[in-house]
Amino acid sequence: MMRLLITTTVPETLETILKNQPRYLAGHFQVELATSPSESFSKVGHNEGLVVHRVPMMRGISVLNDLVSVVRMVRVLCRVRPALVHSYTPKAGLVTMLAAWLCRVPVRVHTFTGLIFPTEQGLRQKLLIWVDRLICACATHIVPEGLGVKKDLESFRITRKPLRVIGYGNIAGVNTAYFSAVAPGVAQSAAELRKRLGLGAEEFLFCFVGRLNKDKGLAELLQAFRALPTTAHLALIGDLDQTAPVDAATLAAIRSHPRVHALGFLGDIRSALGAADLLVLPSYREGFPNVLLEAGAMALPVIATDINGCNEVVEPGFNGWLVPPRDSPALEEAMRLAMQMPAPVRDQMCQHARARIQQRFERQQHWERMGAFYQGLLDSIKRIGE
């Protein structure tokens, strides 16, 4: 079997988002992994049953550390000698693609997820664009996570190479048997959570899942929420993110508002999604947010901003609403409409939400698409060699 090396900056990506995908691919290829050593490192090897190589990689810009990472990745590539290497996340992309180019790995694939440079300005934006152009120059194949990411790569002229979105986008898909309102224990845990929050049948629970930082649109969310009727409640699932902290007024509202429930990080978000009446994601930028797929699989309608990724999952009037980013009045209006929606219309939207995810983003389908994608690339090598 052909050798395949998959790399990520941190093992948490392999432990959560890409979980079990390498194991599936190992049924068709000889798969090994490379990522930074951290608390989750040993879990990845155990979960996937595969060899995991230690290559420390630092998030952010650090020229000396990045050069050390490239040297260590070169050593891994010289030992593994893969026919194909695939990197996810920005720093792993830079380190892996440069090292793989130096080692002349035949097929070098990088997947771009959420792009940072479109929302940056000045010198920082120029530096980020230069890094992404370098990644593309070293790669043989470039995979945008979704059509929005593809459009940004093209409009900023990051590369002239062909860009291919796998399936309908996203890097992992979602297990719709696991993320299901009728999965064992979900209904009970959801009911218990509503009871713990003091919610009756007449209360409407909005749910946000993600890092609590300013780029997630929390300021607009809290402003919109405060204008809603007193039957509205808001559950925030996720930890405070100090890399881009929310403003003081928003943080104070999160901590003091009697109908805002900050539940912190949850290892299993199904109880929160099951307890909620609607998911809201007012982000300023995204790549292809997994939480939209998870909520949809749980038959939960969504209010999201009209940005990359979100507008590839949410179809207004079908499975949710789209609002402009940074627009609190528009967000408030959508939240009011959701609360006022007649039960039959809501039930139909819930059905649409789950059906859309099952049809386009089922995890097993995505794995099969990835396997076919890799096989096509490796077959092209064989034809060239003949």
Question: Where on the chain are the PLM-derived regions?
Answer:
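N-terminal strand-loop element at the rim of the active site
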Residues: 6-65, 152-154, 162-165, 240
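A conserved mid-protein helix/loop that constitutes part of the nucleotide-sugar donor-binding site
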Residues: 15-20, 204-227, 329
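Short, structured helix-loop element that forms part of the nucleotide-activated donor/catalytic region
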Residues: 42-46, 230-259, 263
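Donor nucleotide-sugar binding/catalytic pocket of nucleotide-sugar-dependent glycosyltransferases
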Residues: 53-54, 133-190
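A short, well-ordered alpha-helix in the C-terminal region of glycosyltransferases
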Residues: 192-195, 337, 344-360, 366-372
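Aromatic "clamp/platform" in nucleotide-sugar-dependent glycosyltransferases that forms part
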Residues: 265, 284
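Short hydrophobic beta-strand element within catalytic cores of glycosyltransferases
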Residues: 292, 301-304, 314
